Amino acid sequence: MDLYSMSAAEAVKKLGSETDRGLSSREAEKRLGRDGENLLRGKKKKSLAAEFFEQFKDFTVIVLLIASGVSFATSFLEERGDFADPIMILIIVILNAAVGVIQQRRAEHSLEALKNMSAPTATVIRDGKETIIPASKLVRGDIIEVRAGDLVPADARLITSHSLFAQESALTGESVPCEKDARTAVKKGSEQAEIKNMIFSSTVITAGHARAVVTETGMDTAVGKIAHLLNTEDEPTTPLQIKLAKIGKALGIGALSVCALIFMLSILRGMGVLSAFMLSVSLAVAAIPEGLPAVVTVVLSLGVQRMAKSNAVIRRLPAVETLGAATYICSDKTGTLTQNKMTVTAACSASDEIPLTGDAAKKLFALAALCCDAKHTGKGEVSGEPTEAAIVAAAERSGTDTEKLRRKMPRTDEVPFSSERKMMSVAIKDGDKTITVAKGAPDVLIKHCTDIILNGRKIPMTSALREKILRLNSSLADRALRVIAVAAGDTKNGKPDETGLAFCGLIGMEDPPRKEAYEAVKTCRRAGITPVMITGDHAGTACATAKKLGILSRSGECLTGAQIDKMGENEFAQAVRTCRVYARVTPEHKVRIVKALRAHGEVVAMTGDGVNDAPALKAADIGCAMGKGGTQVAQNAADMILTDDNFATIVKAVAGGRGIYDNIRRAIHYLLGCNIGEILCVFAATLFGMPAPLLPIQLLFINLVTDSLPALALGAEMPDSRVMQRPPRDSAKSFFADRTGLDIVLEGMLIGALSLFAFVAGNSLFKNSCVELGRTMAFAAQSLCEIAHSFNMRSRRSVFSIGIFSNRKLTVCAALCAALQLTVMTVPPLAALFNVSALTPAEWLTVAALAISPIAFSELGKAVGGKRETE
């Protein structure tokens, strides 16, 4: 219904309510049951079972399930009753699925907690009484009261309003609070920004107070309609997910190909079909790193938990990897790069700038505070419209008790500020007389002044003095300060008299940059990341702040929304390469900026807090929503939520993302190298007509214990201290680039050769040589070689140069794996299960010599190849 086009009385009647009494509690309960709660609803949550079974879509997991099924079948057909292999495969697959579900739920709970922190209440009139209720219980027809500082709980038609201003940037992208008036007539079909007689859900009242009737709630509000559109969009696939899927498919196809080859070779050598099939299955088990999905998930989740402690809540685990590849960070100005708190930084008399701590400034601030509605809360905070809050805070800092001053000099009347007048004036009772105090835009207020206060004396205003004041104003404006003029005069009838005023001074204020933002921008530069400011503020203010922070270094790097609108696609595509500040832009411009940068192959992180920012957050590679000042819709659209709304947190998150990617790559490198070693060991033995050196259950133990535990510890490696001193990686680059693929194969060949040598030694070189002894030595050598090799994987530099035991988690995991290996080989029931026998000291000495060989060969290779650092 277009209730904004009706009078307030007609709207209230249409909604079946009463202006003074509101709805009855019974009627409100009835409407709540009919329309539902006043909440924004995201996508329908998947059930626990659905989330669990979704984990089984991974190609690697599917191959493991097939291997498990085949193993069950062969054990059954051979009537062995040995189901240990398939059961262990199933256990690890189920555990991996459980880990995935737990981490996803943990991220969802973090988000829910964030929403609950900002759960609003509403002041409502029901049964003729004013009461405070949860905003979720509001219904259409409720009469609500709003005042400065309130979050508007629902869309509502104003009934009465007094000097009302609302910050609608969350909805419209307009950074300046807009004036609202219950008496404004609005035509049907008007744009939302033109509807001045309504207030909208998720916007903030910055000044004044009003009574209104709720017209829409929940998903029917303006913000709800945008939320509904977002709920229909699917999450994009990240580069990490694509790469892992490719690795999984390659492993699966490779494993099946090798298995088929081994099966045919075995048949040709006269082996029975079932025996050949079991040998092929053992090779499939060796080829696939069963712990890989779980290791990646756990490494991601460990990184996410670490980042959450630094105020970055990750909503989607794979998005962490994308963060590490970011090449552009497009950030809002207000609240993210700046403190989002207007602060007085300059004051001028009629002749010159004056110290902020002097008596003249104290008197100026006190006078201006009398013409402000902002209030000092008594807790060191000031609530109200930002400009007025800055003036009151300055007065308090200079030693004026503003609340006491207002009681001593009460306001008797006022002429409120309006965008047309650009000034506000109040009548103040000062003892036996009444005075007028006015504040506003300097070029407007000076026209109302016939006198000037100079050195404590009132003298007539002259054209020369007027020009001097305007020059002072320009000087402050050139420093990107918002300037307010203050004037005072007498009044005779108790009402503000805006004629014949005496000019008192100028007050300059700004939203200062966050202290930590300076260093964060420098870090971006060192890391090859381009920081960009995108704001709805004026170009002059934006450029001044950007220069202070080091974002803007040359002229000609700023574009306004109006300039963007005039550009063709090709011209704009070229402009984004050099532009570092975008001013007076709309959320639609943000989407265009993101798409233009991505078209150049850039990986873009975009911040946003408003509902209209949601499309840009979705369009970006990494959407970063604000936790404090952000709307629920923006948070739902984002990949990451900054709980402190701080630019420096994004930069820390990028560093964390780089470190996590390094750890994932390190863990996968290690796992694949170990598995290639197992494949080559079994494959080579088959080619030479030897029995299988490793049994399926032994391979499973190696993959799940001596592979996976060190891989997890490698995933907990602390990021390189110089991680932000290198350029972003190319997100399109293969996982196996920069010789990584060759290294994996060479490392696998070494480990496989050492294990095969151990098998041959146990099978032929010792007095009690036999196949079982050979398998025992191969089993021990393969496990211990892989444990030793995990230390090589910490860095491409010498492991001794970084401290071989400096990763305590890896040291503990290595010791635990060695202890478990020893337990399996010495405890009789376990030894029988794994088909191993006890080793003599000479045999153990041989295994130990083979086990330390990977470190020796790795150190030799690093010394010859030079010190190449881990990427």
In which residue ranges do the predicted regions lie?
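Conserved cytosolic headpiece of P-type ATPases
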Residues: 1-725, 735-736, 749, 764, ...
